[in-house]
Amino acid sequence: MGRTLENKQQIVTEIKSLLNDSEMAVVLDYKGLTIKEMSDLRSRLQTTNGICKVTKNSLMRKAIDGDSNWNDLESLLTGTNAFVLIKEDVGGAVKAIQSFQKDTKKSETKGALFEGRLLSDSEIKEIASLPSKEVLMAKIAGALNGVATKIAISINEVPSGLARSLKQHSEKSES
């Protein structure tokens, strides 16, 4: 027995909600993947705040209809698709997908949409090579800490230099 109209509307509403919270969508051809392999992909994506959703292309079309951020996704809606919706750690999620594909050698990336723009395969690979948000924040914090340390040393050096000059001057006066 097929899905009811109400059930389909709930699915479309859920997909719209997921898309509103997502920064990027990656479309995978999941043909030939087992349930265990799909579960493996989902668990890999969990750490990066990504969600793998398998739904009919017609329901995805209804979900993106009228949404300018996701309209270009329509060109990828053919065949058997799994949609990876990424909320935060885009680079980490793309790395997880590529690692999964390397391990299973079954699924292919059909394409991705980021900030309303379709990405080429090379652009998707570039995103995977980016450091995570935590690494970038650590680098910025380290750079800021280095600047603060240099300023503190410079500020401390002025009175120290003055004290050395006064000491030398007093030693000259005593001799």
Swiss-Prot record:
SUPFAM superfamilies: Ribosomal protein L10-like (SSF160369). One of its GO terms (cellular component) is ribonucleoprotein complex. One of its GO terms (molecular function) is large ribosomal subunit rRNA binding. GO terms for biological process: translation. It comes from the Bacteria. Keywords: Ribonucleoprotein, Ribosomal protein, RNA-binding, rRNA-binding. InterPro entries: Ribosomal_uL10, Ribosomal_uL10-like_sf, Ribosomal_uL10_bac, Ribosomal_uL10_bac_type. Forms part of the ribosomal stalk, playing a central role in the interaction of the ribosome with GTP-bound translation factors. Part of the ribosomal stalk of the 50S ribosomal subunit. The N-terminus interacts with L11 and the large rRNA to form the base of the stalk. The C-terminus forms an elongated spine to which L12 dimers bind in a sequential fashion forming a multimeric L10(L12)X complex. Belongs to the universal ribosomal protein uL10 family. HAMAP family: Ribosomal_uL10 (MF_00362). This is Large ribosomal subunit protein uL10. It comes from Prochlorococcus marinus (strain MIT 9301).
